[in-house]
Swiss-Prot record:
This is Exo-1,4-beta-xylosidase xlnD. It comes from Aspergillus niger. GO terms for biological process: arabinan catabolic process; xylan catabolic process. Its main location: secreted. Glycans are attached at residues 29, 124, 148, 242, 251, 357, 390, 413, 444, 455, 573, 576, 665, 696, 718. SMART domains: Fn3_like. The lineage of its organism: Eukaryota, Fungi, Dikarya, Ascomycota, Pezizomycotina. Belongs to the glycosyl hydrolase 3 family. Pathway: Glycan degradation; xylan degradation. Induction: Expression is under the control of the xylanolytic transcriptional activator xlnR and the repressor creA.
Length: 804
């Protein structure tokens, strides 16, 4: 998604018209910024403007007698009838994300570009009172660490409820540019915070739960909001070493494309029925993603089963980037034609609106080519009830949502729950945590809160945030609970100045407990900004080491914040650092969540969804190397292929209590299955044979400790003989969260394992089930294991269409 430069003020449709075509020649980019280096597109006001929105009047307006207002007709027929009324100029004026509408038809201007990554953004928030804020949830990477798919769905559902309430007040669109389901392949990536982490199966489940939560249970008849799966595909670098995302050409094998970079989009299209997909800035194997019919037609529509009339939007200015910097087209008009013909329906930008007339004049496009995309967009709007005249809940359950629904859903406190469930306990020496109120009564306890995150407010939200109702810093949270707080920033995120060290050490000296809150934030990891290093930045480690030396017997707890990981090996190995937690970007209630985890009002059960690599990893090979498998200087990427030793592994996470994990009565320690017998089973109710359940991995989980706690599980598979080498170290095949396991209680964990979990991807991109021996193991400790022997002949279970 493109950087919006600054938050724009609302404009009327007339003002938008003034921003449009007359300025095209004056504003046309003739400076030719080197977008091979510059990662922020120079977006024009017409693109980035937020506008007041209104519904077409199908009762009394000019369209009332047209098919578009006939609620008994199909959404596609209604949309096609509307677009047929447009003149060519009117058609072109509605090909951008900011559609100008058609005033003579009573069709209002419409803004496609709304954001909903972890709450409403690019909404027309009021200055005060109603519609002044919306719930700001934790960033997806922290939410995913909770391993709670119900939570993901619930968050998305709340976002869409609040979005529809804002929409009914003319303050938000019916389409959202979310979720970001790219995988967090390399730790330097600045936008990893927006993603579900480095594992593609996690990303696929996140995509399904988020999209179905946003779109509602019946998207074909009553679409709640249209989700957009982004960024398709192979997008996970911003500006590493001046390699701009706008001009990157990512070389990706068919094997890695099929196995890692696209399965989450396959699930989004086939299973979640996502209504929109965003093509990415980058090129893949020489072709810009928004000009690649292989991605947009062969894969997305023909193979992945994208909904018939779903639309593809470019990332913002990506259509222009086909010309500059990719040089794939000789002019902006040619770039517009390439994108349209490849399958990019809507241009988030102005290239279509300013240059499609030239494309037609050159004979590169016809009106029909352009119409197709606009019809697809308006089909989605019809499904969302944009043209419905009857606003009763019986016919459209979303048109009556209002500010009271925003208040109600925020009061559920799900943002807080998501943060407490996602926070990961990395280290807890001698079980120093939790710092219970019994041992540390707030009225008699002084807490030193030190570090650049100790008084964080806006930092808690990460990026793509709107107006939150409140932002609770760690400092405010501890003060609210009655603790005496000695606050000292000590140092900044990237500071090398030691001028604040003395105050920090003084604050620690007179405290009973020392908490250092630091790490990274959006000054180092953001859109258009990758990290150069994955070490702790600035002199934060120096300050922590001084605090550790001065702590004596006092607990020293370090909060490692931010979306990406930093190398905390020195803290892991320092016996004076009592505990270490990863808190991500925990949202509006982040301070409360961190405090309550530390004090034991909530117990941690999150697990890392990224690998914490040693700092040297970022220097071993180029971040633009997209090959997952180890080769040359590349030691392998993600936990699946990494051949080195992680500081903290993917899936690491500690509890305050102890659990005994054992085979359940239904567990068979060795299973022999015939491939042909499995694949011959009927599966008409499944979209793919890969979804067919093969077995249930079961285990007994007994809480043997002293505290009630949730339990989180990851089930991994590995093999050393099924299919050709090289073999991955392991891969995730399932996961779950058991809530509130009481002391002494035993619960059964049951994780279904599907055919696709036993498939490996060959060099052509085909998913193949090979005969051989697999091992399934529970979590990193591997205390419960099942041996699975597959016999018979290898079979392709998913055929990958190669690019000719």
């Amino acid at each position: 998604m493109a950087h919006s430069m600054s938050r724009p003020v609302a404009a009327t449709a007339a003002a938008l018209l003034a921003l449009a075509l007359p300025q095209a020649l004056a504003q046309a980019n003739t400076s030719y910024v080197d977008y091979n280096i510059e990662a922020n597109p120079d977006l024009y006001p017409l693109c980035i403007e937020t506008i007041p929105l209104s519904f077409p009047d199908c009762q009394n307006g000019p369209l009332r007698s047209h098919l578009i207002c006939d609620e008994t007709a199909t959404p596609y027929d209604r949309a096609a009838s509307l677009i047929s009324l447009f003149t060519l100029d009117e058609l072109i004026a509605n090909t951008g994300n900011t559609g100008l509408g058609v005033s003579r038809l009573g069709l209002p201007a419409y803004q496609v570009w709304s954001e909903a990554l972890h709450g409403l953004d690019r909404a027309n928030f009021s200055d005060s009172g109603a519609y002044n804020w919306a719930t700001s949830f934790p960033q997806p990477i922290l939410t995913t660490a909770a391993l709670n798919r119900t939570l993901i769905h619930q968050i998305a559902s709340i976002i869409s409820t609040q979005g529809r309430a804002f929409n009914n007040a003319g303050r938000y669109g019916l389409d959202v540019y979310a979720p970001n389901i790219n995988t967090f392949r390399h730790p330097v990536w600045g936008r990893g915070q927006e993603t579900p982490g480095e594992d593609v199966s996690l990303a696929a489940v996140y995509a399904y739960e988020y999209i179905t939560g946003i779109q509602g249970p019946d998207p074909e008849s009553n679409l709640k909001l249209a989700a957009t799966a982004k960024h398709y595909a192979g997008y996970d670098i911003e500006n590493w070493h001046n390699h701009s995302r706008l001009g990157n050409d990512m070389n990706i094998t068919q094997q890695d494309l099929s196995e890692y970079y696209t399965p989450q989009f396959h699930v989004a299209a086939r299973d979640a029925k996502v209504q929109s997909v965003m093509c990415a800035y980058n090129a893949v194997n020489g072709v810009p993603a928004c000009a690649d019919s292989y991605f947009l037609q062969t894969l997305l529509r023909d193979t992945f089963g994208f909904v018939d009339h779903g639309y593809v939007s470019s990332d913002c200015d990506a259509a222009y980037n086909i010309y500059n910097p990719h040089g794939y087209a000789s002019s902006q008009a040619a770039a517009a034609a390439e994108a349209i013909l490849a399958g990019t329906d809507i241009d988030c930008g102005t290239t279509y609106q300013w240059h499609l007339n030239e494309s037609i004049a050159a004979g590169d496009l016809s009106r029909d080519d352009i119409e197709q995309g606009v019809i697809r967009l308006y089909t989605t709007l019809v499904q969302a009830g944009y043209f419905d005249s009857n606003t009763t809940k019986a016919n459209n359950p979303y048109r009556d949502l209002s500010w009271s629904d925003v208040l109600e859903t925020d009061a559920w406190n799900i943002s807080y729950q998501a943060a407490t469930q996602g926070i990961v306990l990395l280290k807890n020496s001698n079980n120093v945590l939790p710092l219970t109120e019994k041992a540390y009564p707030p009225s008699n306890t002084t807490v030193a809160l030190i570090g650049p995150w100790a008084n964080a407010t806006t930092q808690l939200l990460g990026n793509y945030y709107g107006n939150a109702p409140y932002m609770i810093s760690p400092r405010a949270a501890f003060e609210e609970a009655g603790y005496k707080v000695n606050f000292a920033e000590g140092t900044g995120i990237s500071s090398t100045s030691t001028s604040g060290f003395a105050a920090a050490l003084s604050a620690a000296q007179s405290a009973d407990v020392i908490i250092y809150a630091g790490g990274i934030d959006n000054t180092l990891e953001a859109e258009a900004l990758d990290r150069e290093s994955i070490a702790w930045p600035g002199n934060q480690l120096d300050l922590i080491q001084k605090l550790a030396s001065a702590a004596g017997k006092k607990p020293l707890i370090v909060l490692q914040m931010g979306g990406g990981q930093v190398d905390s090996s020195s803290l892991k190995n320092n016996t004076n650092v009592s505990a270490l937690l990863w808190g991500g970007y925990p949202g509006q209630s982040g301070g409360f969540a961190l405090r309550d985890i530390i004090t034991g009002k909530k117990n941690p059960a999150g697990r890392l969804v990224t690998t914490q690599y040693p700092a040297s990893y970022a220097e071993e090979f180029p971040a633009t190397d997209m090959n997952l498998r180890p080769e040359g200087d590349n030691p392998g990427q993600t936990y699946k292929w990494y051949t080195g030793e992680a500081v903290y592994e993917f899936g690491h996470g500690l509890f305050y209590t102890t659990f005994a994990e054992s085979s359940s009565n239904t567990t068979t320690k060795e299973v022999k299955l015939n491939i042909q017998d499995i694949l011959s089973q009927t599966h008409e109710d499944l979209a793919s044979i890969t979804q067919l359940p093969v077995l249930n991995f079961t285990a007994n989980i007994r809480n043997t400790g002293k505290l009630e706690s949730d339990y989180t599980a990851m089930v991994f598979a590995n093999t050393s003989d099924a299919g050709p080498a090289p073999y991955p170290k392991k891969w995730l095949v399932g996961w779950d969260r058991l809530g509130e396991v009481k002391v002494g209680e035993t619960r059964e964990l049951r994780v279904p394992v599907e055919v696709g979990s036993f498939a490996r991807v060959n060099e052509d991109g085909d998913w193949v089930v090979f005969p051989g021996t697999f091992e399934l193991a529970l979590n990193l400790e591997r205390k419960v294991r099942v041996k699975v022997v597959l016999e018979g002949e290898e079979e392709v279970v998913l055929k990958w269409p190669g690019k000719e």
